[in-house]
UniProtKB/Swiss-Prot annotation:
It comes from Xenopus laevis (African clawed frog). PROSITE patterns: TBOX_1 (PS01283), TBOX_2 (PS01264), TBOX_3 (PS50252). Keywords: Developmental protein, DNA-binding, Nucleus, Transcription, Transcription regulation. This is T-box protein VegT-B. GO terms for molecular function: DNA-binding transcription factor activity, RNA polymerase II-specific; RNA polymerase II cis-regulatory region sequence-specific DNA binding. Residues 229-276, 295-350 are annotated as: Disordered. Transcription factor required for both mesoderm and endoderm formation in the embryo; signaling determinants and concentration levels may determine which germ layer is formed. Acts together with beta-catenin to activate genes that are responsible for mesoderm induction including wnt-8, eomes t/bra, siamois, mix1 and sox17. Directly binds to promoter DNA. Patterns the mesoderm along the dorsoventral and posterior axis. Activates siamois gene transcription when alone or in combination with beta-catenin, but inhibits siamois transcription in combination with pou5f1.1/oct-25. GO terms for cellular component: chromatin; nucleus. Residues 57-230 bind DNA.
Amino acid sequence: MRNCCRERGFSVGRLEPETSFSCASDVKSSPDMDSVSSQDSLYLPNSIGASLEDQNLWTQFHQEGTEMIITKSGRRMFPQCKIRLFGLHPYTKYMLLVDFVPLDNFRYKWNKNQWEAAGKAEPHPPCRTYVHPDSPASGAHWMKDPICFQKLKLTNNTLDQQGHIILHSMHRYKPRFHVVQSDDMYNSPWGLVQVFSFPETEFTAVTAYQNEKITKLKINHNPFAKGFREQERSHKRDDVLKTLQQSPSKSQKRKKWEDSPEADISDFPKATRIKEESIMDPAGVYQNWVSDHEANQGLTPHSPESEGVNQEQQVPTSSSNFYIKSQYRRSSQHLSSPYDLGEPSSRRLTPDVATVPDSDPDSLAVLHVIPTQNSAQERTCSMNFSMETPMKQPLRGAIYSPYGTEQWMVPAQGPYQPVSYTAYPTDLSAQGAVAHPHSGMSDWSQYSLFPYSCW
């Protein structure tokens, strides 16, 4: 009998049974139990049993094909593995362990709303066993409350060092629960070994849910999946709509702001800057500084000089002003430089002119101007007439002076007449006479041109 029990016994080193058991009646006894007295007959191995908690929930998942997510960092199971034990000795120490074994040697795939075999299974990784954190504990402790393996995690990382259960994706597995009699996990020998498994806990390991029904079941029953529920989504959607109605979006705010008068006021300085930059055109800034020939080539059609709508003509107010400008023109011909044309428009001199009604253009003489290269100030002072364009003939009058031409006449110089000087003039009222001891040019011959100190 002992040899038979040893052959059917559980290998503690590998934690891999030769035969599987799915009910509490299928147990394996240890030879040490033969010494148990008759008073402890109530705690014999065949009296130990286990039941699955949340069996109805597991049954719903099992009917649709349970799927469990596996990740590299590890993912907890749902539904959780939770069992209840009974028939244990209340003062004996026990350990509780869980491992996962493949159901078959096939790899599966999801096709047309069902699972089907897709080939041979991959080599199974080294078997790992998860030990319940309360191990070892007395039988009374294990039978007091349901035993939950909530901290158990599944992973597909074959190099995991966190103690998680290593599984292959698209493979089917089932958990097994082991009850071991031992006072110490490492030193004392393991005695009684009892194994339990439940068909409702079979599942397929996946990295993403394939069956939509399984997804809905997990959303509806998992307390940690409240954020994925459709009811919660509808509430959040309603809240978002309410917030959008209370506070418009940025685009709507911007549209309203652009339509408001504040936007026009804020854009006004920008338009002013653009207008000022457009004035910096050379033809517009120096329009009064160019000659008639240059004006015909570069004058813009919107230039003030090309418009003849003004019925008044600028004329000098005094002849002296024109005379001074003419003198300045003669003296500045040799002083002009290329830098004169680069002066800003703010330094232009505005001539002192007055506006008078324009006369008949047919009776006015046309004044022909010879283009000269003068400075900016010269052109501003000397050119007081409007310029013509090739396509438009403006109305203009001749520049004239309100005074006669006699003021410009200079008396002719006669032959040179020597002026005599008297040493002692008697007429003190004479103007222009200078007293000098010598009366004529011949009297200067007795003096040398240079003093003797220069010899």
